[in-house]
């Protein structure tokens, strides 16, 4: 199970701590592949317990690593307690930067504001903007929380920016040039940088 919890991809180390996700994004790689990078399988037979994640960390070779990323075949904030504990565990043992890749729906998942505690646990946050407007977002992301998801994601991003300098939005270039340009405008309006990622199926 160790390989599934921690894996390397493009010279970075990723923590896959849950398979739970409130979204069904049309472009999500987990729709077509069982793994990416050096992982053999990112689908869990059961959700990993905290002790299993610790064991995976203790056994993993972090050579040449300077940043770990919470990102896998699930939304990391679905396992928020484990995320917080694992971040603390890493910080006590390694000098790594810690990044969270998230859909930004943590407040809806937990029915409360979560930005402050999350920002205390990580060094940077990358939030999947995905689309520049609510209608397009709902069509592509298909969030379990419906129409309120888009505004909740934007609010979460703005809240994070109050506590952490390194917060950014991301979109994938497959959405098209027009949507990318609109996303740049929206990101600027919210005072948050935007990174355009190349789609790699």
Please tell me what each predicted stretch does.
Residues 1-2, 54-57, 111-115:
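A generic local structural motif
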Residues 73-201:
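Conserved AdoMet/S-adenosylmethionine-binding subsite of the radical SAM
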Residues 3-49:
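Canonical Radical SAM [4Fe-4S] cluster-binding loop centered on the CxxxCxxC motif
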Residues 32-38, 64-68, 133-137:
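Short, basic/glycine-rich phosphate-binding loops at helix/coil junctions
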């Amino acid at each position: 199970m160790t390989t599934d919890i921690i894996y390397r991809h493009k010279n970075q180390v990723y923590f896959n701590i849950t398979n739970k996700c409130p979204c069904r994004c049309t472009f999500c790689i987990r729709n077509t592949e069982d793994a990416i990078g050096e992982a053999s399988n990112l689908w869990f037979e059961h959700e990993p317990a905290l002790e299993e994640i610790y064991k995976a960390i203790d056994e993993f070779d972090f050579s040449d690593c300077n940043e770990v990323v919470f990102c896998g075949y699930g939304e990391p904030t679905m396992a928020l307690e484990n995320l917080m504990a694992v971040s603390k565990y890493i910080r006590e043992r390694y000098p790594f930067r810690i990044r969270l890749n998230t859909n930004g729906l943590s407040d809806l998942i937990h029915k409360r504001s979560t930005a402050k505690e999350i920002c205390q646990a990580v060094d940077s946050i990358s939030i999947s903007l995905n689309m520049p407007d609510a209608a397009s977002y709902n069509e592509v992301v298909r969030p379990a929380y419906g129409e309120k998801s888009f505004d909740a994601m934007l609010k979460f991003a703005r809240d994070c920016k109050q506590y952490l300098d390194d917060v950014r939005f991301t979109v994938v270039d497959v959405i098209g040039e027009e949507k990318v340009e609109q996303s740049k405008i929206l990101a600027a309006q919210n005072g948050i940088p935007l990174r355009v990622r190349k789609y790699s199926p």
